[in-house]
């Protein structure tokens, strides 16, 4: 039987840890067993404890001190060390064959865009440990206030989709922060990215450098031509919002198919 997990990705500050905590809270409410696997060697304490924590193997602070490296260099060193010691990860995961695992990943996108660290870990999980994985990429909703930032984030999401080679869900997080700043009609154009949004924004700025206008047009057209990037709205404090996103993840990972069928009751009580 395949194991099931979700990789939580996105830039720093996108709300990944909050999203992980919300999933755990929802699953506990409905009686599902789930655990957070922390893959960020610089992670801070969260509401729910990490069941598996890369910092038990190696931590960013220790590497920076002992190897005299900066934060980014130390992060890469930590993941290269993890790749050389995947037997540690195998042993830790080995105790959780039937539980749902939530992999909380670092926010540095170079771990999958510049060096194949996360893609290698994903391949190990899917091929060696028999995981059905879904990737969720979080982009914070305030980015929609600046169309250029939004399309930059959408391009990063598309990069993750292509390089990780996993079924993928993009999530527009922290939606509650922009409710008073954008109407539903315009928000829908961001959930299904409309290339014209970027052109409309740049068109209002007559002082824009023509080279930037052409670059923005190419970026917007690239996202539009691929047709891969769409977003689901997320409010982490809204149980219905969490349940909706989790239903998409469950459908992709085929979670329900791996559950044992329950025998029906022999006798049904009927109220008189």
UniProtKB/Swiss-Prot annotation:
Coiled-coil residues: none
Known EC number: 3.6.5.-
Residues the record lists as binding GTP: 13-18, 173-176
Motif Gly-Pro-Asn (GPN)-loop: positions: 70-72
Organism superkingdom: Eukaryota
Record carries keyword Nucleotide-binding: yes
Keyword Hydrolase among UniProt keywords: yes
EC primary class: hydrolase
GO biological process, one term: protein import into nucleus
Site (Stabilizes the phosphate intermediate): 72
InterPro entries with a match to the protein in the record: Gpn, Gpn3, P-loop_NTPase
GO-annotated molecular function: GTP binding; GTPase activity
Key words, A-Z: GTP-binding, Hydrolase, Nucleotide-binding
PANTHER family named in the record: GPN-LOOP GTPASE 3 (PTHR21231:SF7), XPA-BINDING PROTEIN 1-RELATED (PTHR21231)
Subunit structure: Heterodimers with NPA3/GPN1 or GPN2. Binds to RNA polymerase II (RNAPII).
Family, per entry: Belongs to the GPN-loop GTPase family.
Function: Small GTPase required for proper nuclear localization of RNA polymerase II and III (RNAPII and RNAPIII). May act at an RNAP assembly step prior to nuclear import. Promotes sister chromatid separation during anaphase.
This protein's name: GPN-loop GTPase 3
Organism: Saccharomyces cerevisiae (strain ATCC 204508 / S288c) (Baker's yeast)
